[in-house]
A protein has these predicted regions:
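Short loop->beta transition adjacent to catalytic acidic/histidine clusters or analogous donor-positioning motifs
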Residues: 3-7, 29-38, 62
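Active-site-proximal specificity loops/subdomain of glycosyltransferases
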Residues: 39-96, 100-106
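A conserved hydrophobic helix/loop-capping motif in glycosyltransferases and polysaccharide synthases
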Residues: 7-16
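Short alpha-helix within the catalytic core of nucleotide-sugar-dependent glycosyltransferases
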Residues: 23, 89, 100-113, 161, ...
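Long, low-complexity intrinsically disordered regions enriched in Ser/Thr/Pro/Gly
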Residues: 37, 52-53, 57, 125, ...
C-alpha cells in the first residue's frame, strides 16, 4: 500500500534474458507492492518455467495471468490482459519485461495519486524517443531524427479530426499515414548502445535523466508504453475498454483525443528500456544488459 492505495504491478512476459534483470528489481520492492501480476505470454517453454518458478517463490504475491491465446506475439493477447485493471483505490503500473532499471518508483505512484486529472503517468524512460525529445536532449537525437517531433505534431494536428471515425481495430498512425517511428532512435541498435552506455556512465546526474516537475503531455504523441501507471478509478470513470485496438496509440492518442484528458510525466523518476525489437540483435552482442544486472 502507498498513500492509501493498493499497488499492483503488471508485466507482460517474457524472456528469461530480460526477466533475470527485472524480477530482482520488482522483488526488492515487495514490502510496499501489494501484488505482482505476470501476464504470461512466453513462447519458449524454458522462459515459462522461469516465470512459474519465480511465482512459486512468492505465493500470494505473484499472480500468473494467462492470455486468451497462449502464447503468441499477438495484440489480441496483449490487450486481453487489461480486462481486470480498473479496481477503485488501486494504482496499476505496467512494466514491460525489458525494463532493466528503475529509480524512484514510489515517485511515479505518488504523482499518479496526486494527479487524478491525468489518465496515464509515465516516468522518464531511457530509450523511449519521446522522452528524449520532450526533455530537449538534442545531444541524444541523431541528425536523421531532428525534425521527427515537428513533423509528427504538424501531421497529427492536421489529421486528428479523423480519429473518432476510425474503426477500433485500426492502427491510428497507419490510418492517418503518419511517420510513426524516428528512423535511427527506434531502429538502429548502434545508436541504442551509445545511449545506454551514456546513461550507465552518468545516471547519478538525476537532473539529466528525469523531469524536474510533473509535466503534462498536451499534444497527441504516441509515447511508447514501456512503463506507465494509472488509477483504476479513472478507468472505471471513463469506461476504458480496450478490446481490439493496439494499446499504445489507444492510450496515448485515441483516449486523450476522445476524452479531452491528457497524460503526463512524473517528476524525478527514471526507468531504462533495454530494446525495441530492431535494436535487440546489436544490443545482445554487448555487455549492456549485464551492466544493468550488476546495478542491484
Amino acid at each position: 500500500m502507498r498513500g492509501g492505495y493498493r499497488i499492483v504491478i503488471c508485466s507482460p512476459v517474457g524472456r528469461k534474458q530480460n526477466l533475470a534483470v527485472l524480477f530482482p528489481i520488482i522483488e526488492s520492492m515487495k514490502g510496499w507492492i501489494d501484488e505482482y501480476r505476470i501476464w504470461m505470454n512466453c513462447r519458449d517453454p524454458m522462459d515459462m518455467v522461469y516465470c512459474l518458478e519465480f511465482a512459486k517463490k512468492h505465493p500470494g504475491w505473484v499472480t500468473i495471468v494467462h492470455g486468451e491465446k497462449p502464447y503468441t506475439f499477438d495484440m489480441i493477447n496483449f490487450i486481453s490482459f487489461y480486462a481486470n485493471c480498473h479496481d477503485e483505490n488501486t494504482i496499476y503500473i505496467k512494466i514491460d519485461d525489458d525494463i532493466c532499471y528503475i529509480r524512484n518508483l514510489e515517485g511515479l505512484v505518488d504523482e499518479t495519486i496526486a494527479h487524478p486529472e491525468r489518465l496515464f503517468v509515465f516516468p522518464y524512460i531511457v530509450n523511449n524517443f519521446w522522452c528524449q525529445i520532450l526533455k530537449g536532449q538534442d545531444f541524444l537525437i541523431p541528425d536523421t531524427d531532428k525534425d521527427f517531433a515537428a513533423r509528427w505534431k504538424a501531421d497529427m494536428d492536421k489529421e486528428k479530426y479523423k480519429i473518432k471515425t476510425l474503426p477500433r481495430d485500426m492502427f491510428i498512425p497507419k490510418a492517418l499515414k503518419l511517420d510513426f517511428f524516428p528512423r535511427t532512435m527506434w531502429g538502429d541498435g548502434r545508436y541504442t548502445v551509445i545511449l545506454h552506455d551514456h546513461f550507465l556512465n552518468t545516471k547519478e546526474d538525476t537532473s539529466k535523466w528525469s523531469f524536474p516537475e510533473f509535466t503534462t503531455i498536451d499534444d497527441l504523441i504516441a509515447v511508447s508504453i514501456n512503463m506507465v501507471a494509472w488509477r483504476g478509478s479513472n478507468w472505471k470513470k471513463y469506461n476504458v475498454q480496450i478490446t481490439t485496438e493496439e494499446d499504445e496509440t489507444y492510450f496515448t492518442v485515441r483516449l486523450p483525443y476522445e476524452l479531452g484528458v491528457f497524460n503526463g510525466f512524473a517528476a524525478n523518476t527514471t526507468a531504462a528500456h533495454y530494446s525495441f525489437y530492431p535494436q535487440k540483435e546489436i544490443l545482445d552482442q554487448t555487455d549492456i544488459l549485464d551492466r544493468y544486472s550488476k546495478l542491484r
